[in-house]
Amino acid sequence: MQQVVDLQSDSGFQALGVPVVSISFDSLDEQAPEAQALGITSVPMLSDSDHAVSQAYDVLQWAIASGEPGHTFILVDADGRIAWIQDYGAPDNPARTMYVPIEELTRKVRQAIGK
């Protein structure tokens, strides 16, 4: 969840004006204590316990051995279409990075939105 904390607080990312939503297989009851302890206040935490969102955005193609998605970022445009998607835990990423530097995410999102 440190990624969410940093996205919420980084002024460079916030200047892009892109809302962030964190979606996890974990229930809200499982997510809430850590989110509260980390001070996550401006990023909605959603549960995808039935995998409907993961299936809709086809992120299960990068699922880890347990069947859970890895660490996927999806930028959805105003029309609901995927403008950019990147999974940082995919099998083709040997480092299976679970934290992506905010500067990298800011750069990729900036490119995708043309800023």
Q: Where do the PLM segments sit?
A:
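Short low-complexity, flexible loop/linker segments enriched in glycine and/or proline
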Residues: 36-38, 60, 102-105
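Short, flexible helix/strand-to-coil boundary loops that buttress conserved ligand/catalytic motifs
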Residues: 35, 57-58, 86
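Structural microenvironment flanking redox-active thiols in thiol-disulfide oxidoreductases
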Residues: 1-41, 52-53
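Solvent-exposed coil/turn segments that connect beta secondary-structure elements
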Residues: 26, 49-50, 78-79
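Structural micro-motif
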Residues: 40-44, 60-74
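Thiol-/selenol-based redox modules, centered on thioredoxin-like
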Residues: 67-115
